[in-house]
Amino acid sequence: MAYIESNSGKWEYVIGLEIHAQISSKSKLFSGSGTTFAASPNSQVSYVDAAMPGMLPVLNEYCVHQAIKTGLGLKAKVNKYSVFDRKNYFYADLPQGYQISQFYYPIVQDGTMEIPTSTGELKTIRINRLHLEQDAGKSMHDQSPHYSFIDLNRAGIGLMEIVTEPDISSPDEAAEFVKKLRSLLRYVGSCDGDMEKGSMRCDANVSVRRKGEPLGTRCEIKNINSIRNIVRAIEFEAKRQVDLIENGESVIQETCLFNADSGETRTMRSKEEAADYRYFPDPDLLPVILSDELINELKASLPELPDQKIDKYITKFGLSKYDAEVIVADESAAKYFEEAANECDPKLLANWLINELFGQLNKASAEISECKITPNDFAKLIKLIEDNTISGKIAKTVFEIMFETGKAADKIVEEQGLVQVSDSNVLNTVIDEVIRENPDSVEGYKGGKDKLFGFFVGQVMKKTGGKANPGLVNQLLKEKLGS
């Protein structure tokens, strides 16, 4: 468990998260309007979205199905009876004067998700609920010095709000939870998890306490838009609360915003309670009643989920838990790996995928779907290493050319004459030459200077242009030098 260190001792973090995930749907939750990101302002707005008088909402069945599948992925209870409520508040980008949400009877509740901790153990985070609600529009304050404008394109887009219990004990655990949840949503296909575009947003409820004490007063940090900022925002807010308490002041329950530039939270408004919103069932919408048949059908349609894949990669492919988790975290990377793993050594493939391919993709700020190297060609590169056609060092050169051009590994090796030298007769000739040219080093090595062995290996590699088989060079050198 992580602690906040202060002059008076250690303080514990107590953190709960609320994740707002936009449902990947072509139309909105209660209207047929489109949901394309970055469309021109107010180009995807129906009379329902604009709350014109007499317009009635019609529930999008697909959004309901996506919420159910997400709930099943969270090992949660899917409620066969759920109700939409009106959450009443006024804001300029909420044309109805209320938000349609689910307060009393959510569609999903009582789920769990396991996350890795700093000790390497798994920790279970309880999911209180997942409910459906509509997103608000967007206020635009940078278009004019005199006016604010409203874009209702986002108004009415379906959201899943996923609420955890306050089981999270550090900023890093919060980040791990969000990363794992994002991965799950992408596998299920219910949300693309793109925090930069706002399709996944995080609110963090943060309080502090000394060990063994009751829960402290919590503050909510709204709309955190990146994994890194989740850590920064929670760290700052917790430290702020500790400083207040140690100075004899009280923590006021409030809603904050995090400023990514200053790294600080600032008060947005006092924290509302449920009573402030005057929730009541929406009279325009019938309760959602689900059958066992539908729930079972959606459960059967779920793909292999991240935890299942990790177990498979460990047992079937022999990967380490770490390697399996890194690959499975990105669904596209997992598909790429599985396609290539049928053609080569999975362990060696995983090593190259994580250390070389992911590294190059990060440098290029590219996704694996944009990679010019096909899974089949990547597997062929690994096979060339496996059968000693090329050395690991040469393979890195070949890989870099493949990444830039998309050329097949065998063609690059052939064109550039990079085949590894594994002929003992050829290597013995080179080794004899190295020994002949370096009598002092030979004498020093035989006199006990073992580190000189690396010098001889380096000389052989230099003379062969790095193409000598390293393992065979080591073996032959030891024979020649009598070690």
Curated annotation (Swiss-Prot):
The keyword Transferase does not apply. SUPFAM superfamilies: GatB/YqeY motif (SSF89095), Glutamine synthetase/guanido kinase (SSF55931). It is an enzyme of class 6 (ligase). It catalyses: L-glutamyl-tRNA(Gln) + L-glutamine + ATP + H2O = L-glutaminyl-tRNA(Gln) + L-glutamate + ADP + phosphate + H(+); L-aspartyl-tRNA(Asn) + L-glutamine + ATP + H2O = L-asparaginyl-tRNA(Asn) + L-glutamate + ADP + phosphate + 2 H(+). Pfam families: GatB_N (PF02934), GatB_Yqey (PF02637). GO terms for biological process: glutaminyl-tRNAGln biosynthesis via transamidation; translation. Coiled coil: none annotated. Its EC number is 6.3.5.-. GO terms for molecular function: asparaginyl-tRNA synthase (glutamine-hydrolyzing) activity; ATP binding; glutaminyl-tRNA synthase (glutamine-hydrolyzing) activity. Keywords: ATP-binding, Ligase, Nucleotide-binding, Protein biosynthesis. InterPro entries: Asn/Gln-tRNA_amidoTrfase_suB/E (IPR017959), Asn/Gln-tRNA_Trfase_suB/E_cat (IPR006075), Asn/Gln_amidotransferase (IPR018027), Asn/Gln_tRNA_amidoTrase-B-like (IPR003789), GatB (IPR004413), GatB_C_1 (IPR042114), GatB_Yqey_C_2 (IPR023168), Gln-tRNA_amidoTrfase_suB_CS (IPR017958). Transmembrane segments: none annotated. NCBIfam families: gatB (TIGR00133), PRK05477.1-2 (NF004012), PRK05477.1-4 (NF004014), PRK05477.1-5 (NF004015). Belongs to the GatB/GatE family. GatB subfamily. Heterotrimer of A, B and C subunits. Allows the formation of correctly charged Asn-tRNA(Asn) or Gln-tRNA(Gln) through the transamidation of misacylated Asp-tRNA(Asn) or Glu-tRNA(Gln) in organisms which lack either or both of asparaginyl-tRNA or glutaminyl-tRNA synthetases. The reaction takes place in the presence of glutamine and ATP through an activated phospho-Asp-tRNA(Asn) or phospho-Glu-tRNA(Gln). This is Aspartyl/glutamyl-tRNA(Asn/Gln) amidotransferase subunit B. It comes from Rickettsia bellii (strain OSU 85-389).
